[in-house]
Amino acid sequence: MANSCRKLIFNIYVVFYCSAVIMPQICICSQFTSSPIDQFNKDPKAFPVATNGEIFPWHELRLPTVVIPLHYDLLIHPNLTSLDFVASEKIEVLVRDATQFIILHSKDLEILNASLQSEEDVRYKKPGENLTVLSYPAHQQIALLVPEKLRAHLRYSVAIDFQAKLADGFEGFYKSTYRTLGGETRTIAVTDFEPTEARMAFPCFDEPLFKANFSIKIRRESRHIALSNMPKVKTIELEGGLLEDHFETTVRMSTYLVAYIVCDFTSVSGTASSGVKVSIYASPDKWSQTHYALEASVKLLDFYENYFDIHYPLPKLDLVAIPDFASGAMENWGLITYRETSLLFDPKTSSTSDKLWVTKVIAHELAHQWFGNLVTMEWWNDIWLNEGFARYMELISLNITYPELQFDDSFSNTCFEVIKRDSLNSSHPISNEAKTATQIKEMFDAVSYNKGACILNMLKDFLSEETFRKGIIHYLKKFTYRNAKNDDLWHSLSNNCLEGDSTSGGFCYSDSRKTSNTLAFLRENVELKEMMATWTLQKGIPLVVVKREGRSLRLQQERFLSGVFKEDPEWGTLQERYLWHIPVTYSTSSSQAIHRHILKLKTDTVDLSEKTDWVKFNVDSSGYYIVHYEGQGWDELITLLNQNHTLLRPKDRLGLIHDAFQLVSAGRLTLDKALDLTRYLQHETSIPALLKGLEYLELFYRMVERRNISDVTENLKHYLLQYFKPVIDTQSWLDEGSVWDRMLRSTVLKLACYLNHAPCIQKATELFSQWMESSGKLNIPADVLTIVYSVGAQTTAGWNYLLEQYELSLSGAEKNKILYALSTSKHQEKLMKLIELGMEGKVIKTQDLATLLFTTARNPKGQQLAWNFVKENWTHLLKKFELGSFPIRMIISGTTSHFSSKDELQEVKLFFESLKAQGSHLDIFQIILETISKNIKWLEKNLPTLRKWLLTSI
């Protein structure tokens, strides 16, 4: 697509019109060298065939830009009894080039009629001309054929009447149900359009670049309410007792942000400092669980308005807990929808982790009101500009608004999580081509979200928080109500200097940042766009290899590949053409100051000012790279940890544990060396570091347990219970202490009970018995609920009682804990019953099926059961979840990513190949095959070492 609207050849009138009227919000440049009519006339045989057998006049997946929408007028009438809806719309469009057809998106809609009026027709109230409608479902497009060619630079009004069933899944305009305390099932209608499902609710230009205003009217029964992006203006009484709600016209926005709901929910409301009304909606029986969300939403909205120096532009903000919701939440402008467990908080059954999750998701979605809604990416290849920023802003906002949640200490795990994905060759660049609806859905992954956030955090550390904040404010203000791309962000970050700032390479530092390290940066003359292109336009993560030679540090960078060893024949090919501009940081035994250097070459040398005993790179794990220390580097750091680990920052200790075990997977560090590093953990007081060490040891335990390698399983179990006995024994069974104290408690006790630690089993059994005897009325501390339920689920009586309580519970947090516990049963018939209930979607909602299959597959007794179910029911699963959607990807990865034998690899490969059009092209399949291969290599290389190390350690 062209970079500037100046490239358009318009007459003087159109140039003026675009500049004065459209440019502040939308000025779409043609992506084609000739008009659609010219292309069609030149070679009509190259075009597809519509459903009626006629030639469909458009053959691209992307819509032509000769006609652009300015305003939609929508009238929707859902029937919650017959579960369908009828609707009509008028779209005001601007014709930029003469054409005889208009191409729109439409999916599963029955078009009843379509007509067209010119500006003159509208002015003189002339009836519209009927249009011929052609449909091409393969591209989810319709063509409106006009009798006479539409004239360039004029506006027209397109009127369409249509109808459809409310969707059965979780996309478009769909139905959702909930049960009241009295056992009644009630139905609501709700929308979820991102990324490409607005076309399931109304014919539209369903691409993010086509921003427009929306005026929405909804018809409903009096027992329901209607919600939409904007406040309600008025309600009109219609014949037959129906009501018609009219909503204010929206600001200019993309179709995927349009939202409306018809429901019978109740709400609690508050007001932000700026006067914006904030409301939390939920089903009536769950109203009491909305109060924490209201507190958090008001506080976070106040924060963002201040931080971005831009007022939230709408008069109200509604947050709604939806009973059936596939993802965590959706940032519809002014009407944010959530899965119930992402918004509701029950003080009795919601744990510390639940509270952190709810707060984090609210922070994420509110950040989208600026990043994504106010400024939107041009196309889905840059979805990271929405999602990476929203994830990054979770960190920034929660550090200020909820410091007691200590979110800063958990952000490193955001980066560690995506490194597992990004270190595979099947990864993709942050900014990646996406054309089809399935490819677009697959872009919503850890790379776009987490890696996006991590490189932004690294860039913030590089530029300084002050400079970075100025840059993003500049970016948001410049592109308000418009679309942006990668380069626009780098330009904004490079051009926000104030008087007196030091400048270099287009970016700036305030006087307060003029340290020796900063001056070294300035001498590097870094070009920000060039630097960040190495992080967004190529996949993967760099490995920085450090070797200390006297008072010099020899640095080398290469691509870090998990599961590919340097001696493997493909290693060299996979390294070709990879080079990053890495803003490395380090500290030494001689100086705790943070030293900085930009590694732009394959090899480089850094001179130290004085002799040092050790050096630690990637200070506070703020950089997105792995570090390997050659020579005596690792031995020096292991000695340091054992002698006085507090000489390193807590996040540096966390980073060392992570990097060490990642390097084992790449064959760069021996497993015994990494395990030796964890010996200091008995003295560790930083809980994130302690939990990271436990995480890897538990991972190894589950791996050998699944493979039934009994001697290693027993020895590792013995080691865990022996080595971490002091930590286990000091845990209480109460909800007390800091956030990290409570997360340590739940993690350690959960592992101890999983390992059949007698005191843990005894205490959990005691609490479960008391809970059953109280008919579920006993309040068990929320942080240990999962543990107590999991132990209780091991008996038939306990399992059955938990299933009964699952049906009765009004707390989504409690239902999640019960469902997890039920999936830990050792009885396969019980596990199969659970999965069948999940497929049925009544007792266990379909939205929870993916999680259920994931947790069942983690159970050694359920791993093959879950996998067999997926193979046998793939077609049925695709009827419930869209191809490429997060639930489908979770189901595939959850049931196969733990496989570690060649037979399992072959079985999975054959299944994937058999799917063909039903999914064989999905990126997740390549990820899984590579993951299983990595697991196989890990065991082959490291099992003997693990066995030997354990024998010398217990």
UniProtKB/Swiss-Prot annotation:
<feature type="glycosylation site" description="N-linked (GlcNAc...) asparagine">
    <location>
        <position position="644"/>
    </location>
</feature>
<keyword id="KW-1015">Disulfide bond</keyword>
<dbReference type="GO" id="GO:0016020">
    <property type="term" value="C:membrane"/>
</dbReference>
<dbReference type="Pfam" id="PF01433">
    <property type="entry name" value="Peptidase_M1"/>
</dbReference>
<dbReference type="InterPro" id="IPR001930">
    <property type="entry name" value="Peptidase_M1"/>
</dbReference>
<feature type="active site" description="Proton acceptor">
    <location>
        <position position="365"/>
    </location>
</feature>
<keyword id="KW-0645">Protease</keyword>
<feature type="glycosylation site" description="N-linked (GlcNAc...) asparagine">
    <location>
        <position position="399"/>
    </location>
</feature>
<feature type="binding site">
    <location>
        <position position="364"/>
    </location>
    <ligand>
        <name>Zn(2+)</name>
    </ligand>
</feature>
<dbReference type="GO" id="GO:0008270">
    <property type="term" value="F:zinc ion binding"/>
</dbReference>
<dbReference type="InterPro" id="IPR050344">
    <property type="entry name" value="Peptidase_M1_aminopeptidases"/>
</dbReference>
<dbReference type="InterPro" id="IPR045357">
    <property type="entry name" value="Aminopeptidase_N-like_N"/>
</dbReference>
<feature type="disulfide bond">
    <location>
        <begin position="753"/>
        <end position="760"/>
    </location>
</feature>
<feature type="disulfide bond">
    <location>
        <begin position="415"/>
        <end position="454"/>
    </location>
</feature>
<keyword id="KW-0031">Aminopeptidase</keyword>
<feature type="topological domain" description="Cytoplasmic">
    <location>
        <begin position="1"/>
        <end position="7"/>
    </location>
</feature>
<keyword id="KW-0482">Metalloprotease</keyword>
<feature type="binding site">
    <location>
        <begin position="328"/>
        <end position="332"/>
    </location>
    <ligand>
        <name>substrate</name>
    </ligand>
</feature>
<dbReference type="GO" id="GO:0005789">
    <property type="term" value="C:endoplasmic reticulum membrane"/>
</dbReference>
<keyword id="KW-1133">Transmembrane helix</keyword>
<dbReference type="GO" id="GO:0005615">
    <property type="term" value="C:extracellular space"/>
</dbReference>
<feature type="topological domain" description="Lumenal">
    <location>
        <begin position="29"/>
        <end position="954"/>
    </location>
</feature>
<feature type="binding site">
    <location>
        <position position="368"/>
    </location>
    <ligand>
        <name>Zn(2+)</name>
    </ligand>
</feature>
<keyword id="KW-0479">Metal-binding</keyword>
<feature type="transmembrane region" description="Helical; Signal-anchor for type II membrane protein">
    <location>
        <begin position="8"/>
        <end position="28"/>
    </location>
</feature>
<dbReference type="Pfam" id="PF17900">
    <property type="entry name" value="Peptidase_M1_N"/>
</dbReference>
<dbReference type="InterPro" id="IPR034016">
    <property type="entry name" value="M1_APN-typ"/>
</dbReference>
<feature type="binding site">
    <location>
        <position position="387"/>
    </location>
    <ligand>
        <name>Zn(2+)</name>
    </ligand>
</feature>
<protein>
    <recommendedName>
        <fullName>Endoplasmic reticulum aminopeptidase 2</fullName>
        <ecNumber>3.4.11.-</ecNumber>
    </recommendedName>
</protein>
<dbReference type="GO" id="GO:0002250">
    <property type="term" value="P:adaptive immune response"/>
</dbReference>
<dbReference type="InterPro" id="IPR027268">
    <property type="entry name" value="Peptidase_M4/M1_CTD_sf"/>
</dbReference>
<comment type="subunit">
    <text>Heterodimer with ERAP1.</text>
</comment>
<comment type="function">
    <text>Aminopeptidase that plays a central role in peptide trimming, a step required for the generation of most HLA class I-binding peptides. Peptide trimming is essential to customize longer precursor peptides to fit them to the correct length required for presentation on MHC class I molecules. Preferentially hydrolyzes the basic residues Arg and Lys.</text>
</comment>
<keyword id="KW-0256">Endoplasmic reticulum</keyword>
<dbReference type="InterPro" id="IPR042097">
    <property type="entry name" value="Aminopeptidase_N-like_N_sf"/>
</dbReference>
<feature type="glycosylation site" description="N-linked (GlcNAc...) asparagine">
    <location>
        <position position="79"/>
    </location>
</feature>
<comment type="similarity">
    <text>Belongs to the peptidase M1 family.</text>
</comment>
<dbReference type="InterPro" id="IPR014782">
    <property type="entry name" value="Peptidase_M1_dom"/>
</dbReference>
<dbReference type="GO" id="GO:0043171">
    <property type="term" value="P:peptide catabolic process"/>
</dbReference>
<keyword id="KW-0862">Zinc</keyword>
<keyword id="KW-0812">Transmembrane</keyword>
<keyword id="KW-0378">Hydrolase</keyword>
